[in-house]
């Protein structure tokens, strides 16, 4: 039962967390709350979707085949899909260009223009309901001071990042919530190096002097390193601040943020439904995706 009307309820029900699961099958192999039980193995899993799981070889492939009991099986155009877990972006791109894969959702930035010219009918570039952002650990100096946090944000030339590093036609973000549908958020913080230097000086760090060593946490992907190095250069050029980059594999990266053992960290969020709330409620005090130590009572009252 809803506490109040929610216009985006139909959008939420499309999320995978709302998909029905077979209770009887789960209980045959353990308790409902147990993780990694045998009910998800190909020989045990019960599903009601377009495809059924036939093979799952860890770090090798996931194989699905058309579900003969699917209600609309006549309109399913392919017999199956083989998913390949490829960790190296360039390896995946090479496999696609060599004809070893039919579909890839990623392209190395330096290969985007090549792909557009060589395979114009195969490349699709569509807007995504997502935002890249940087987390600041507000429990650790110097980011306890909002002037420092804003200064670091104002020192980022977003358009330069898009043009010279990302190269995928992204749009500069004016805030955490991206534009979509008829929703057009106001720009809260943009590129303003002079304003950034002024704020940093007001906080007691003119030209970056007196700042403790700042570590920028990111993942171990090749593109993550390039993004981090671009930010590192901007903060040096626009604030006079030296940043140390620390790359970690995904699990360690997430754990380190949960433990708030970082200064700055690369982040991003893909909206789960078409409403600003999907980008805002993660910043509640006890939100599992907050990971910054930040909270604001007035903000939470407005959300509720």
Which residues fall in each region the model found?
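Short helices/loops that flank or line small-molecule/ion binding pockets
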Residues: 90-100, 117-118, 146-147, 229-238, ...
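Gly/Pro-rich hinge or "lid" segments in bacterial periplasmic/extracellular proteins
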Residues: 3-6, 13-76, 80, 90, ...
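Short, solvent-exposed loop/turn segments at the edges of secondary structure
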Residues: 46, 57-59, 76-78, 118, ...
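Beta->alpha turn/N-cap motifs
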Residues: 4-5, 89, 105-111, 158, ...
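Ligand-binding "clamshell"
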Residues: 113-125, 260-262, 275-290
């Amino acid at each position: 039962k809803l506490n109040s009307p929610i216009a985006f309820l139909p959008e939420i029900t499309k999320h995978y967390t709302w998909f029905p699961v077979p209770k009887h099958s789960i209980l045959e192999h353990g308790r409902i709350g147990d993780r990694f039980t045998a009910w998800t193995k190909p020989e045990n899993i019960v599903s009601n979707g377009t495809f059924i799981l036939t093979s799952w070889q860890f770090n090798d492939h996931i194989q699905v085949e058309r579900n003969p009991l699917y209600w609309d099986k006549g309109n399913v155009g392919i017999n199956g899909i083989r998913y390949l877990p490829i960790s190296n972006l360039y390896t995946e791109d090479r496999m696609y260009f060599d004809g070893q894969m039919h579909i890839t959702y990623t392209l190395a930035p330096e290969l985007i223009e090549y792909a557009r010219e060589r395979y114009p009918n195969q490349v699709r570039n569509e807007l995504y309901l997502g935002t890249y952002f940087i987390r600041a650990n507000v429990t650790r100096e110097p980011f306890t001071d909002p002037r420092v946090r804003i200064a670091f944000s104002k020192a980022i030339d977003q358009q330069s990042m898009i043009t010279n590093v990302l190269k995928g036609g992204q749009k500069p973000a004016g805030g955490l919530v991206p534009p979509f549908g008829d929703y057009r958020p106001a720009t809260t913080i943009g590129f303003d190096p002079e304003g950034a230097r002024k704020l940093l000086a007001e906080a007691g760090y003119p030209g970056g002097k007196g700042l403790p060593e700042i570590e920028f946490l990111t993942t171990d992907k090749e593109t993550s390193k390039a993004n981090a190095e671009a930010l590192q250069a901007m903060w040096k050029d626009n604030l006079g601040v030296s940043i140390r980059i620390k790359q970690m594999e995904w699990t360690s990266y997430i754990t380190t943020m949960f433990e708030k053992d970082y200064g700055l960290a690369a982040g991003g969020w893909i909206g789960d439904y078409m409403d600003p709330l999907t980008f805002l409620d993660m910043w509640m005090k006890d939100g599992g995706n907050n990971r910054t130590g930040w909270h604001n009572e007035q903000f939470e009252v407005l959300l509720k």
